From Swiss-Prot:
Main location: membrane
Topology relative to the membrane: Multi-pass membrane protein
UniProt name for this protein: Inner membrane-spanning protein YciB
Gene from which this protein is expressed: yciB
Subcellular location(s) per record: Cell inner membrane
Membrane-traversing stretches: 1-21, 49-69, 77-97, 120-140, 150-170
Family: Belongs to the YciB family.
Assigned keywords, A-Z: Cell inner membrane, Cell membrane, Membrane, Transmembrane, Transmembrane helix
Assigned GO CC terms: plasma membrane
Database matches in InterPro entries: YciB (IPR006008)
Summary of the function given for this chain in its UniProt record: Plays a role in cell envelope biogenesis, maintenance of cell envelope integrity and membrane homeostasis.
């Protein structure tokens, strides 16, 4: 359900584009959908994920420019701007604190050695940098319709494959919690034999 919630604005953008074949109309649907996502999160949970708020600001600025100038260049840059800013946040996050951003987000759920946290964090930097570049390549070398398809299916598909690869990496490097000593091992249990 959370995945659908996170991708609701882009799915709506895709559907509106496919039904109208007009990127300005699709962008005009994307802006309020992103705002509704933020508002829903606030009213339901009394908090807004920073990523959703960040996406709203970028969508309003670049989407607004797309609508104002009737130029799809701005909205085509939006995924790249988001990816590159995320890469910068992941990169700088480790420099300003003892723990990198990925570790701070995930350490409550999993335990990994420090080198694994670092590799995961840097892999997000590299992935987002490359995904942002790939988005612009598709935007400038393919048709608008192909870019819209890539924005939903290509970027989402690559993100899911990357997340699965991260899951495999994590499973290979997880630190097992020490099992609690059993009572018989500590000598505290009843050792009755019949």
């Amino acid at each position: 359900m959370k995945l659908l919630f996170d991708f609701f604005p882009i799915i709506l953008f895709f559907v509106v584009y496919k039904t109208t074949n007009d990127i300005v109309t699709a962008t005009a649907a994307l802006i309020p959908a992103t705002a509704a996502q933020v508002a829903f999160s606030w009213f339901k949970y009394r908090k807004v994920e920073k990523m959703h708020l960040f996406a709203l600001v970028i969508v309003v600025i670049l989407g607004g420019a797309t609508i104002l100038f009737k130029d799809d260049t701005f909205i085509k840059w939006k995924p790249s701007v988001v990816c590159w800013l995320l890469a910068v946040v992941f990169l700088i996050g480790g420099w300003v604190s003892k723990k990198n951003l990925y570790q701070r987000m995930m350490e409550a759920n999993i335990s990994l050695p420090q080198h694994a946290w670092s590799k995961l964090n840097y892999s997000w930097v590299i992935f987002n940098t490359l995904l942002g570049a790939l988005n612009l390549y598709v935007a400038y070398h393919y048709t608008q319709e192909q870019w819209v398809n890539f924005k939903l299916f290509g970027m989402l598909g690559l993100s899911l494959v990357f997340a699965l690869m991260q899951g495999v990496y994590i499973s290979r490097h997880m630190v097992e919690d020490e099992p609690a000593p059993s009572e018989s091992a500590t000598g505290n249990g009843d050792n009755k034999s019949f």
